[in-house]
Each structure stands twice: as C-alpha cells, then as structure tokens.
Swiss-Prot record:
GO CC annotations, alphabetized: collagen trimer
Gene: col-90
Top-level taxonomic group: Eukaryota
Similarity comment: family membership: Belongs to the cuticular collagen family.
InterPro entries in alphabetical order: Col_cuticle_N
Segments of this protein annotated with the region Disordered: 95-117, 146-305
Presence of keyword Disulfide bond: yes
Protein name: Putative cuticle collagen 90
Length: 305
C-alpha cells in the first residue's frame, strides 16, 4: 500500500473515532435532559395536586375535602363523607341553623421536620394551567436570601440613540508659531516702474597727467599650437659622395634545375681492325699467336659504307 493509502486510512479512522465520541457525548446530553424533564414533570405533578386540594377546600362549604378517589378497600358501614349526613327520605329540606362551635381540641404533637422541597414552578405558568382567579397566589414574602454570586456579563446592548449635537466650543488659544516654510516658487516678472526724476548734474573732472609706466606683467599662458605650414620647395641636388665600402659576399645561390637532354650526335666512321690470322688444319696442333698490337689497341677504325 502506498503512502497515500496509509494517509487516507488514518483520516478515515480518525473520522470514525470522532463520530463515536460525538455520539456518546450526544447520548449523555440526551440522558441528562431526560432526567431534568422528568424532574420538572414530577414537580409539576406535586404542584398540580396541591393546587387541586386547595381548590377543593375553597369550594367545600364545611372546609373539609371530599374523598374524590374512593378507596379500593371495602368501606365501613354508616361512614359517609363529612360534607352532609341528611336523611335519605327527606326531600327538599331546608338547611338547618349552624350548630354551636365545638370545644377547642388539644394541641397536637409537633411533626418531624420534612425534607427541603424542590424549587417551585413559575407562578404565571401555574395560574395559566389551573385558572386561579386573580393571577398568582398571594403568599407572604419570605426573608431576603443571601446575595447571590455575581452573574456573567450580559450580552452587548443595542446601540443607543444618537445624541443631540453639543454647543460649539470656544475658540482655542493661538498656537505657537510654526517653522519657516519652504521657499516658494519665483513669482512672475512685475511691470516696469515709472521713470524716476532726473538726477543732479555731476561734477566735471578733467583728465590728469600721464602716469609712470608700470612694471612688466606676468608671463601669460602658452598659446594654442599653430596650424601646420605648407610643404616647402625641393632643394637643389647636392654633390656626388665618395664610393662606399664594398659589401660582404652574398650567400650561394640554390642549385639550378637540370638542363634539357642534348640532340643526338652524327654517325661516326667505321673503325679499322686487324684481320684474323689464317687457320691451320685441325689435325695439326698449332698455337695461335696473338695479333700484333696496334696503336689503337688492336683494332682499327673501319670505314662505314
């Protein structure tokens, strides 16, 4: 598997783990919300039952409550509700006068201190559910509780209405003199002014006597080079000079090319030669004598025909 595959698998695994963590967090929040809702429902049931009992007491003429929900067990004989115990045969009997108040009963024993109840529901919602006349039940105000902790900072309020413009302020004191500004641009040339009045005539002076000659001045700087002059005329030929010293011998020349072949010569005359000696018989042993030598080496020039 390539590196890209490992990276993709790692990303998928992280996504699955984050999803499982988010699901567990959501389930925990849902369970806590369910417990809170059930607690509020139980509180509402308790308040509803208490309010119903109070309404029954207000509606009963004797101030006693009637057992609306009969017991599931068998009731005793001749036990009736505390509201009325009239004869069953009487029909339309008027109510009798109220009896004298009974003797005050003995003070009962103090009950055990009960557990602290849960926080009650909002009075406005209770009045809306049970239609209590006059709105909320008028209960005596309890003692002031201890000051609570400082609450969190509330949300930012809406922008306020734009206020009216205030009166104009007084003129401020003159500030210190600022630094000198930059030199401005040169203005346009002005018009020529009018001619002024003639001046007073000047004093006439006569030329004075000639002064003594001054000292020689310093040498001036060298002048610029002059232009080239025109070429002069050729001079006359001078006398012949004495002969010079002989020069040294020159180097040998390179060998020349071979000459052409000469023409063939004329045919020469035949040379003279000595005649051969006479032969002898073969049977006779003889010794040939050499021919006499001649001045031409034994041969003579022969003539050519």
């Amino acid at each position: 598997m390539s590196t890209i595959g490992y990276i993709g698998a790692s990303i998928c695994l992280l996504g699955v783990l984050s999803s499982l963590f988010s699901i567990s967090h959501i389930v925990r929040d849902i369970n806590s919300l369910r417990d809170e809702v059930e607690g509020r429902v139980d509180e509402f049931k308790v308040l509803a039952d208490d309010t119903w009992q109070r309404l029954l007491v207000l509606q009963s003429p004797t101030g006693e409550t009637e057992n609306v929900m009969p017991s599931i067990f068998r009731s005793k004989r001749f036990v009736y509700p505390g509201m009325c115990n009239c004869d069953s045969n009487s029909q339309g009997c008027p109510a009798g006068p109220p009896g004298p108040p009974g003797l005050p009963g003995k003070r009962g024993d103090e009950g055990v201190v009960g557990d602290l109840g849960r926080s009650g529901a909002s009075g406005i919602s209770l009045a809306a559910v049970h239609h209590i006349p006059g709105g909320c039940i008028n209960c005596p105000a309890g003692p002031a509780g201890p000051p609570g902790q400082q609450g969190p900072v509330g949300p930012q309020g809406f922008p306020g209405v734009v206020g009216t413009c205030g009166p104009s302020g007084d003129d401020g004191q003159p500030g210190p003199a600022g630094p000198l500004g930059d030199k401005g641009a040169q203005g346009p040339k002005g018009f020529d002014g009018a001619d002024g009045p003639d001046g007073m005539p000047g004093t006439a002076y006569f030329p004075g006597a000639v002064g003594q000659p001054g000292e020689p001045g310093w040498l001036g700087q060298p002048g610029l080079p002059g232009k080239h002059g025109e070429p002069g005329q050729d001079g006359e030929e001078g006398p012949k000079g004495a002969p010079g010293t002989p020069g040294s011998n020159g180097r040998d020349a390179y060998p020349g090319q071979p000459g052409k072949a000469g023409e063939p010569g004329a045919v020469g005359k035949d040379a003279n030669y000595c005649p051969c000696p006479a032969r002898r018989d073969s049977k006779t042993e003889s010794v040939h004598e050499p021919p006499a030598a001649s001045q031409n080496g034994g041969y003579r020039k022969a003539k050519r025909h």
